[in-house]
Amino acid sequence: MENKRICVISPSLQMGGIERQLTILSAYFVKRGHDVHFIACRAGKHFYELDSRVHFVEPPFVHTAKASSKLFSYVKTISFIRKQIKRINPDTIMVFGDIINPIALIANKGLGYPIYIADQISPKQNLGRFKNFMKRITYRSATGIIAQSKMAADYKYEVFGSDINVRIIPNTMRDIVDCPNAEKHPWVVSLGRLSYEKGIDRLIDAFSRISGHDDWRLVLIGDGPQRNQLEEQVKKLKISDRVDFLGSRNDVDALLAQGSIFVLPSRCEGFPNALCEAMASPLPCITFDSVSASDIIDNHINGEIVRDGDIEGLSSAILSLMDDETKRTLLAVNAYKIRERLEKNKIGDMFLDFILEKM
């Protein structure tokens, strides 16, 4: 493949799933010999480090949270992106983010560069009238749309029309730190932000219904706005002595390696990175069918899928794995294969094949 100039547009380089994905993909693109230009739409402290060969630019202005200034910020961002696109003169553009996608599409209007966009949220997530309106009036102008799952692709066809160019490409996986000597504990582990959409309250409810297994603990990795509320829920259910809130941690892989079961109880997910990381650990995993799980889990083969909102079903699935070490081992062995499926070179090539399809 002839080397091309690729423009990558990201919300920022701050901590976030989009930023992590684009950092990984940008590094892979330059590894393949392409000239990569990375535009961050929001200036600020950088959580991720780009490959030194990636050209980077961010706006000289800082966004404000005031509602009265949001429209002005949008206009400034559109102008900034348009100016950078003209300067870079890319062969193709790739944008991630439900807020940034419409802005980038407007900025590219009249310039005619191929532009590929990707949402990173669940199709079930309501963004509000304004954002939904912006998506409806701009998305059809994209050269191509990247969907993380079949559920997301079907939704895009339904909303934007059956004639749009959609490709299903899952997220790539970060490098997992192997911990072969980790001591296993009777832990039911969950990883994620402590917020409503992550559904930790549902997991706590399900765990509280399990009796006769007092040696098992519920270990929650992550922090967020619902932490106090969840801690109160644990107290009311009288299971405080069996639940650990670990907060945000830098040793996630080591903690996963010590666990015995992983549960992702989310109400909605764009692409369940935490689930994939747990499978790669490897751990036997349980999730609701609300997170495009069927794209990742073959039910009863490499994980367990429970009907969304079925708390009793989730509790039963957890109990079944607690009582069956052989089943846990079998699911974990099969789950480990997710590493090969989401290997970054393989996923990186899928992105390149799509965003360079018109070359």
Sequence positions of predicted segments:
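Short His-centered aromatic/hydrophobic patch
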Residues: 95-101, 119
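Conserved acidic donor-binding segment of nucleotide-sugar-dependent glycosyltransferases
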Residues: 299-300, 304-311, 320-325
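A short, well-ordered alpha-helix in the C-terminal region of glycosyltransferases
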Residues: 242, 313, 320, 327-341, ...
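Aromatic "clamp/platform" in nucleotide-sugar-dependent glycosyltransferases that forms part
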Residues: 248, 267
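Short hydrophobic beta-strand element within catalytic cores of glycosyltransferases
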Residues: 284-287, 297
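N-terminal strand-loop element at the rim of the active site
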Residues: 8-16, 20, 24, 28-72, ...
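A short, active-site helix/loop in glycosyltransferases that binds the activated sugar's phosphate group
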Residues: 140-166, 173-175
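A conserved mid-protein helix/loop that constitutes part of the nucleotide-sugar donor-binding site
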Residues: 19-24, 186, 190-209, 214, ...
